[in-house]
Amino acid sequence: MTGKTLYDKLWEMHEVKRRDDGSSLIYIDRHILHEVTSPQAFEGLRLAGRKPWRIDANIATPDHNVPTTKAERQGGLEAIADEVSRIQVQTLDENCDDFGILEFKMNDVRQGIVHVVGPEQGATLPGMTVVCGDSHTSTHGAFGALAHGIGTSEVEHVLATQCLVAKKMKNMQVRVEGKLPFGVTAKDIVLAVIGKIGTAGGNGHALEFAGSAIRDLSLEGRMTICNMSIEAGARVGLVAVDEKTIAYVKDRPFAPKGSDWDKAVTQWQNLVSDADAVFDTVVELKAEDIKPQVSWGTSPEMVLAVDQNVPDPAVETDPVKKDSITRALKYMGLSANQPITDIQLDRVFIGSCTNSRIEDLRAAAEVAKGRKVASTVKQALVVPGSGLVKAQAEAEGLDKIFIEAGFEWREPGCSMCLAMNPDKLGSGEHCASTSNRNFEGRQGAGGRTHLVSPAMAAAAAVTGRFIDVRELIQA
């Protein structure tokens, strides 16, 4: 009998019923809520006279719309200038209070981006099914959990029934073997993967990351990679459970305790793909070939190593690709064959559910220490992923390093990742961003986003352009 993949095992563990149409009813262990995709779901419960099926399976926190300046946060809900944003945050508070759901409210130290808060609280555990009304829920797959985003109607379904109807996906494995070169990070791995397979490469697949380079990553690095599985076309990203996974989860608030912990660890150790498991697709990369990456266009697959030049549509034979490159160059204000290192930056954003954890901030601070933000850079933001990450960074003195260098040290939230709060790009502005999407207008109408690692973003901030971060730091 052929072995099972990690995805196969997780699916079978949670399959309640297989339906005649080929879909299945899947049990959901953890549901994370935020202010944007939950209001209609709660209203649906009220209209139907229902209550959440399992209240303790849900946690909530506002993140997308919250302001990130200290003054705005101290002002409370009334200080949220945008009326829609204010109503959404207030409505989440009211809904969680009404239905008895645990919420880390805007000024709770535990508040933050949903995909940072879940793991740091231990609300995300190996072997779980985890859903949230946000596509980057794939982040939680770093723990050997089956995690994916859902729509607003599905948020209501989970609240009401603790189950979802889903169709099983195919299995894809991305193997990254070898040692990463100095200065190359998890963000560079996943950008290189997307550059290789494209944004449709993982369509219809659960994407498991494996290989020695993945095993060498910390859990925070693995979260970065699983986070951007979505940009590779997959709905699910996974990394097998190992001793690092278990060590990260141990003693966190929601983690099992005592004998329950021992039983859980025994079960979790089986959350790996069997040696003889067969994947529908296998993609391989050599870690030593990966360099610091920079996206140049309007899709995450439009990415290059920092020492390369922007492509020339004139030499592209595929008419669709030719048109895509031409359009991207026009929107981004770049020229064919322009060196990546010639791209000048207006703003820098270090944050988002991709790269706002303590290791990300440490990496950026290492570059910023003793340097100053370039005079040509209008703004450089550092936005921790949660209040607890912020507190840890401040305990380590990272905030002082950033502030002395000329960065703005902010309160936790999604911030400039998306144009749903006051942190936005102006039209035509180039931003080095540690977020996950560089679509047209993603960070503000007419804004031009370049995806990079935290260290590369910090290097861009202090030089005013893209530079190989390895020119600034020592091994």
From Swiss-Prot:
Pathway where it operates: Amino-acid biosynthesis; L-leucine biosynthesis; L-leucine from 3-methyl-2-oxobutanoate: step 2/4
Sequence positions that bind [4Fe-4S] cluster: C353, C414, C417
Keyword Iron-sulfur included in the entry's annotation: yes
GO biological process entries: L-leucine biosynthetic process
Pfam families: Aconitase
E.C. no: 4.2.1.33
Cofactor mode of binding and number, as noted: Binds 1 [4Fe-4S] cluster per subunit.
InterPro entries to which the protein is assigned, alphabetical: 3-IsopropMal_deHydase_lsu, Acnase/IPM_dHydase_lsu_aba_1/3, Acoase/IPM_deHydtase_lsu_aba, Aconitase_4Fe-4S_BS, Aconitase_4Fe-4S_dom, IPM_dehydratase_rel_enz, IPMI_cat
MF term (GO), any: 3-isopropylmalate dehydratase activity
Cofactor(s) of this protein: [4Fe-4S] cluster
UniProt KW keywords: 4Fe-4S, Amino-acid biosynthesis, Branched-chain amino acid biosynthesis, Iron, Iron-sulfur, Leucine biosynthesis, Lyase, Metal-binding
Enzyme type, top EC level: lyase
Record flagged with keyword Transmembrane: no
Catalysis performed (reactions): (2R,3S)-3-isopropylmalate = (2S)-2-isopropylmalate
Xref: NCBIfam families: leuC, PRK05478.1, PRK12466.1
Known function: Catalyzes the isomerization between 2-isopropylmalate and 3-isopropylmalate, via the formation of 2-isopropylmaleate.
Assembly and binders: Heterodimer of LeuC and LeuD.
Stated family: Belongs to the aconitase/IPM isomerase family. LeuC type 1 subfamily.
Protein known as: 3-isopropylmalate dehydratase large subunit
Naturally occurring in which organism (per UniProt): Ectopseudomonas mendocina (strain ymp)
Source lineage: Bacteria, Pseudomonadati, Pseudomonadota, Gammaproteobacteria, Pseudomonadales
Name of the coding gene: leuC
